[in-house]
């Protein structure tokens, strides 16, 4: 029951469900051709249908923060179409622009919509985050052999692959060490901790939990991303912004965006249908890439410098200009 103040005054203490409430609310906006509505990861939210039905001549922008399609093993809850976006795709003729994070995702989404006989609106590639203006190069001395990962602790993030790779790499180079930032469900976290414990790796692999990493990244030499996929990867962007060398699996989309082979790190060949079932061989390749990065100090310093250069493409003014261009181009 709505209280008799604010919007409650409009509805005179009527008992209505949330869909009807949102429909009435959207109607009161009186949307017109000068209005732009941005739906930010709203696939499950109840205002989508009322907004579509009452948009008038306003413009709709739909922002995708996750992938639209998953192969087997790639996601714990979805297979093939990502049903978070089902309604958007079914009624895509009502949308003026889809916004995704990368050009690779843009091409993939366009092909997907055509394959499923969906209307293809304009699609723009605009990163979902930015590196602050005036961010300076770190003057910190980076810890020798240090690796950082920053993500949820979930199977899709491949932390088990990373841990096993570091264990193998440490057998060759005893300076290599890993700090794991992030949290997850207790069962999976315990599984990861047991891998470390059983290998006797507690002294060089540490679980750091969740924290603000803004002042932490610059202490590390290498950022590792062994996710099975990354729609964008804000932590990857933050890492290149602080000049870290990069290593990860050759998967869509974020790893390929921020890891430039032989420029700021290495991408490791990966095929989910074969490698996911044979992680031991995969870990041999990923461990070799980690060892290689630390073999040559001069090359590692060059990787750091190149990451800073790559980060320039993601400064705030660059991202702002992309949004301004999109708004200017809305038909």
Question: PLM features: residue spans?
Answer:
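Aromatic "clamp/platform" in nucleotide-sugar-dependent glycosyltransferases that forms part
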Residues: 228
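Short hydrophobic beta-strand element within catalytic cores of glycosyltransferases
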Residues: 245-249
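Nucleotide-sugar donor phosphate/pyrophosphate-binding loop at the beta->alpha transition
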Residues: 18-21, 69-90, 132
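A conserved mid-protein helix/loop that constitutes part of the nucleotide-sugar donor-binding site
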Residues: 145, 149-168, 190
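Nucleotide-activated donor-binding/catalytic signature segment of Leloir-type glycosyltransferases, i.e.
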Residues: 190-210
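A short, active-site helix/loop in glycosyltransferases that binds the activated sugar's phosphate group
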Residues: 48, 85-86, 90-121
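Glycosyltransferase donor-sugar binding loop
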Residues: 130, 150, 177-191
């Amino acid at each position: 029951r709505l209280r008799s103040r604010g919007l409650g005054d409009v509805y005179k203490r009527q008992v209505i469900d949330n869909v009807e409430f949102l429909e009435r609310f959207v109607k009161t906006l009186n949307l017109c051709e000068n209005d732009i509505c941005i739906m930010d990861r709203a696939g499950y939210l109840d205002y989508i249908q009322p907004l579509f039905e009452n948009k008038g001549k306003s413009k709709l922008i739909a922002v995708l923060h996750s992938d639209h399609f998953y192969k087997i093993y790639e996601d714990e809850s979805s297979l093939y179409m990502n049903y978070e976006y089902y309604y958007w795709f079914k009624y895509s003729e009502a949308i003026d622009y889809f916004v995704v994070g990368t050009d690779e995702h843009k091409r993939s989404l366009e092909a997907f919509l055509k394959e499923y006989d969906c209307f293809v609106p304009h699609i723009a590639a605009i990163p979902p985050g930015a590196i602050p203006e005036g961010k300076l190069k770190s003057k910190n001395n980076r810890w020798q052999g240090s690796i950082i990962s920053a993500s949820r602790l979930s199977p899709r993030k491949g932390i088990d692959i990373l841990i096993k790779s570091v264990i193998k790499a440490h057998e060759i180079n005893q300076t290599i060490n890993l700090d794991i930032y992030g949290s997850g469900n207790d069962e999976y976290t315990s599984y990861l901790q047991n891998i470390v414990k059983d290998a006797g790796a507690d002294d060089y692999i540490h679980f750091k939990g969740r924290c603000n990493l803004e002042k932490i990244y610059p202490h590390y030499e290498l950022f590792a991303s062994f996710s099975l996929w990354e729609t964008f990867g804000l932590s990857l962007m933050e890492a290149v912004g602080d000049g870290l060398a990069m290593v990860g699996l050759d998967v869509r989309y974020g790893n390929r965006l921020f890891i430039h082979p032989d420029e700021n790190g290495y991408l490791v060949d990966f095929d989910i249908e074969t490698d996911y079932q044979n992680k031991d061989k995969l870990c041999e390749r990923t461990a070799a890439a980690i060892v290689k990065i630390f073999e040559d100090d001069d090359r590692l310093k060059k990787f750091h410098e190149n990451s800073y250069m790559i980060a320039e493409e993601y400064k705030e003014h660059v991202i702002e200009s992309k949004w301004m261009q999109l708004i200017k181009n809305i038909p």
